[in-house]
Amino acid sequence: MVLGLVSLLLSTPAVAEVLEVTEVIAHPQHYDRKEVVVMGQVSAVQPITDKQGQPAFQFLLKDTAGTLKVISRVPVQEGDQVIVEGTFTRRRQGGRLAVYNEVSAIVIRPLNQFFADLVG
């Protein structure tokens, strides 16, 4: 089913290539500060305040073989299946802490919304 979805996504001109989370993690220097599209399941959702002082969320995006951290202003729920489009950063200094393998989401689409768009 996931492979079928990836094929549909790749055949749609408006959507960039969907990457495996493990591909991004395995080649962080290649994707650093570039826009990526990844999909997976949302977990460990936490409300935060972003750099501009706005309410936001951080969560983990998991696929079958890897996990990325995502920062977003779009609310998500634990267990959601989503497509995330955003800018990947392999290392960001957050005060005293270094944050690795993070996507700053620009767009988050629920997979069920994508299927509805295909049908409708």
Protein language model annotation of sequence segments:
Residues 1-11:
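Bacterial N-terminal signal peptides
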Residues 13-120:
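OB-fold and OB-like single-stranded nucleic-acid-recognition modules
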